[in-house]
Amino acid sequence: MSRIQQTFAALAQQGRKGLIPFITAGDPDPAKTVEFMHALAAGGADVIELGVPFSDPMADGPVIQRSSERALARGVTLKHVLADVKRFRETNQTTPVVLMGYANPIERHGVDAFAADARAAGVDGVLVVDYPPEEAAVFAEKMRAAGIDPIFLLAPTSTDARIAEVGKIASGYVYYVSLKGVTGAGNLDVSSIAGKIPAIKSRVPVPVGVGFGIRDAETARAVAEVSDAVVIGSRLVQLLESAAPEGAVAALQAFIAELRAALDGAANTAR
């Protein structure tokens, strides 16, 4: 059982919902990424999604695009991201880490080399935004062979056939994009999310995390009531973008702790 699978099994046993925060590696300060990861874990994150900076992040809104641009301007590459995970693992062997990004940096690194290097660094999962499931079976198998969960996106527009295709190759969890468009956009409609989740659950044998548009404890709690986990990214990247450097770590941990309390409150209400 992978570290991600163990985490979700423990959450299910406890009747709790997962909290999956996203930050971009190397932003706003490459020297602080590992410290930010520890702050996320200390605040109550169950899984950490670490963004790999890329020059054309087509699925991301302006907040994460700017974040990626800043990290690239500071020279952050996939190798630096793997080094950050390795440093994080020196003192945290329990919190799963998922790399989220685009195919180009991985393909330039070499898929086989990436699988080996990611595993050696302590990566638990990988979500490649621009790998459609119909074309990702070989990639997914190589990740699983290295002990890494291949994670895929689903959207409101995903057909039953697309959902079933993802169900065949995904492990760890799936990430349901609750809004059409790019990250950080729009307003959440929890009823429409609740209407889509059963179709996913019936075809995908792994937990469902919901993200895009979650900005605060209230929206996180609402989404947690209809999903297995809540994914939050743009709001955290925005927080780090605007926070004073000396207070960024504490602000990040405090915000995650607020979300954690909201999710645990939702779980207690449901019991």
From Swiss-Prot:
GO terms for molecular function: tryptophan synthase activity. Keywords: Amino-acid biosynthesis, Aromatic amino acid biosynthesis, Lyase, Tryptophan biosynthesis. CDD domains: Tryptophan_synthase_alpha. InterPro entries: Aldolase_TIM, RibuloseP-bd_barrel, Trp_synthase_alpha_AS, Trp_synthase_suA. Pathway: Amino-acid biosynthesis; L-tryptophan biosynthesis; L-tryptophan from chorismate: step 5/5. The keyword Lyase applies. Its EC number is 4.2.1.20. Disulfide bonds: none annotated. The active site is at 49 (proton acceptor), 60 (proton acceptor). It catalyses: (1S,2R)-1-C-(indol-3-yl)glycerol 3-phosphate + L-serine = D-glyceraldehyde 3-phosphate + L-tryptophan + H2O. GO terms for cellular component: cytosol. Pfam families: Trp_syntA. The alpha subunit is responsible for the aldol cleavage of indoleglycerol phosphate to indole and glyceraldehyde 3-phosphate. Tetramer of two alpha and two beta chains. Belongs to the TrpA family. This is Tryptophan synthase alpha chain. It comes from Burkholderia multivorans (strain ATCC 17616 / 249). The gene is trpA.
